[in-house]
Amino acid sequence: MEGNAKIEPQDRENLSPRFRMMAAVDMNTTGRKKGKWYVAVPPLCRAWTGLTPADYFGRSLVEQLPEEIKVGVINVAVGGASIDLYDEDKTTEYISKQADWFKNFCKEYDDAPMRRLMECAKE
């Protein structure tokens, strides 16, 4: 999920370096670069998105796992999207029927969110 909850100061505190995120897009305002791993300081999706379910899921997970285990997330999401956005046989047609704001979000993933996810996962 993209995340739209307001990020508050406590959401950026006491973060475990074992919970990591890979930037799926360049985030100029945060200095993050696509394909690079970072401590999972929100926002995890794109530079202007909010808090996601992955934020506290990942934090809770690392608290329960042995110290030597790290958790990483790659968030490639567009709010309000159907699963068709991630079906490479349907992506182009699905995007073509959406509002301009939606198309602009998809452009950040080169109009291929699933492909971007797979590219990042191979890094």
Predicted regions and their residues:
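Cell-envelope and extracellular/periplasmic
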Residues: 1-123
